[in-house]
Amino acid sequence: MPERVVRLAEEVGQVTGQTMQGIEQVAKSTKMLALNALIESARAGERGAGFAVVAREVSEVADRARTLSEDLSGELRPRIAELTELGHQLVARVRGQRLADLALNAIEIVDRNLYERSCDVRWWATDAAVVDALAPGAPAAAAAFAGRRLGVILRSYTVYLDLWLADAHGRVVAHGSSTRARDAVGSDVSGQAWFRAAMATRDSDDYAALDVEQHAGLGATTATYATAVREGGRADGRPVGALGAFFDWEHQAQTIVEGVRLTPAERESTRVLLLDRDGLVLAASDRVGVLHERVALCTDGQPSGTYTADGTTVGFALTPGYETYPGLGWYGALVQRH
């Protein structure tokens, strides 16, 4: 609709300009005819005196028509120009707000998705099979059973790449995948960020959300959620190990950025992005620059908004969080070429 208003304003401007030029040309032609008539009436002497009066009147009418045309053109031209400019501004504002709304929708989907991940890991860390596998003196069969239990969970929750269970020393005792990281059991993860963060959680309500990264062991991009497994499964129990849930970030995030509702024409000229707090590209609809490129958003301290830069319109939105998940300071952003 705003684009149609702009087109109409531009068309009115063109038609008005052409019409004013036509009127001015008619006035000039009429003026010339009047002058020629005066010349001929002068040659005719007294017999042309009456015709001379008519010729002068026609000349005056032509002058008035030309003056009116110039006045009308002078009045309309700046107003049509202003209307066109206002239309362009309206189009830019509507387009920008739409992009900002779509950016917010995208980051809200991410938030709701990751909120569920934070709930999953805390719940599974209290599973009896997981707790029993880390109990002092637990037999090897307990760890094997925990692995099978994690496998059952993994088959139902297909958004995860794997689930790893490590003891208090950082040794992986069980994991759920039968196709990935087959050498995970027995490996040392004590130096990995997810394990250290999990062991530092305060109680069973606490969890750690790690930055998106390329996980060497799993051969994929993950967003890891972790928490401590506590003695006896009690909320305030002593940490006896850690559970790490490796979310399939690349596939899930790509589904989100490619699923933003754009028209075919918009999709050709628009890049949908998920960015971390430092502007690092976490996902991109064109799959370019992921975990390498940084985009500097001009937010002016606002949680959402729009602006134009370098021939593009940018709409952005900061993560609002969801329920007990506060978000990680990430942004949704759409960059549309003009």
Predicted regions and their residues:
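Extracytoplasmic/periplasmic sensory segments of membrane signal-transduction proteins
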Residues: 93-203, 257
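Alpha-helical coiled-coil
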Residues: 9-39, 71-81
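Conserved beta-strands of PAS-like sensory domains
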Residues: 218-260, 315-317, 327-338
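Solvent-exposed, extracytoplasmic
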Residues: 145-156, 242-290, 299
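Extracytoplasmic/periplasmic ligand-binding sensor regions of membrane-associated signaling proteins
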Residues: 159, 169, 175-247, 308
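EAAAR-patterned alpha-helical heptad-repeat segments
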Residues: 27-71
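Amphipathic coiled-coil signal-relay and dimerization helices
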Residues: 124, 133, 171-177, 275-286, ...
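Extracellular/periplasmic juxtamembrane segments that couple receptor/chemosensory ectodomains to their
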Residues: 293-338
